[in-house]
């Protein structure tokens, strides 16, 4: 099988919600957050962080291992979430 066909096959098999251009990790959570807790405790991520659901009533949500600012993930935990008129929410990180 040529490489291009193999790559397209792999992309069709992988679920698209796992790819998130805005940063963070999209995870499937159940109504009680157990799925999210399992994700956060996997490997070296034994931390408790908050997640937001993608849409109200959805079982999909986004988890940030640093800090969440509206729907974005900040680069570091010490960043603050700010709102800039005309630009929306963003992270302000101290150097």
From Swiss-Prot:
Query: Pro-region residues?
Result: 25-45
Subcellular location, principal: secreted
Q: Which residues carry this modification: 4-hydroxyproline?
A: 56
Q: What tissues is it present in?
A: Expressed by the venom duct.
Record family assignment: Belongs to the conotoxin D superfamily.
Instruction: Please give the subunit comment from the record.
Output: Homodimer; disulfide-linked.
Anything further noted?
Negative results: does not affect the human alpha-3-beta-2 subtype (when tested at 6.5 uM).
Q: What is this protein called?
A: Alpha-conotoxin PiXXA
Query: What organism does this protein naturally occur in?
Result: Conus princeps (Prince cone)
């Amino acid at each position: 099988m040529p490489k291009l066909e193999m790559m397209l096959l792999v992309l069709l098999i992988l679920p698209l919600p796992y790819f998130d251009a805005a940063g963070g990790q999209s995870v499937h959570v159940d109504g009680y957050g157990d799925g999210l807790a399992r994700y956060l405790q996997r490997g070296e991520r034994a931390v408790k962080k908050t997640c937001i659901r993608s849409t109200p009533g959805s079982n999909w949500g986004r988890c940030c291992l640093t800090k969440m600012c509206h729907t974005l993930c900040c680069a570091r935990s010490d960043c603050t979430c700010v709102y800039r008129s005309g630009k929306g929410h963003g992270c302000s990180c101290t150097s």
